[in-house]
Amino acid sequence: MKKIVILFILMVTLQTLSAQKYGYLNKEELYKSIPEYDSATVQVDKLRNEYENMLASMQGEYSSKTTSLNNESATISDYLRQTRQDELKNLSVRIQLFSVRANAQLEDKKNQLLQPIITRVDNAIKAVATEQGFIFVIDSGQMLFTDEKKCTNILPLVKANLGVK
């Protein structure tokens, strides 16, 4: 009787293990197929370029003023030299503050534009995985190897759920 119970438990365990379903998809590829994602990344890139141009302009001004001060240092009064050095310090602080604030605003804009898309994608993945009975789904963009014979690519199913091609 004891052997029969052990055999039964072993059979149930093996049956349960063989019935498990695994899914995978490339999340980056999925994002790129969503038109709103492209639009959001274009907006973020445009803002990033604006900030980079402004920062480059400020750094150019700093470099120009530094060169000018170095060239005139021997011919100007101590008071004027000190005044220009103070201006350079203030400009340096402004550059640093601008850089920090620009990065924070860029991150906020990125989150504002992309978070709804990320949430929508995550919800679609969960819906498809639950509907199809997958026990877990792997992002194949993060994996070194995926045995495609033992798991299912759910990218087409998730795209259909999202209504994208």
Regions found by a protein language model. Name each.
Residues 1-22:
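Bacterial Sec-dependent N-terminal signal peptides
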Residues 20-165:
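Amphipathic, charged alpha-helical segments and their helix-to-coil junctions
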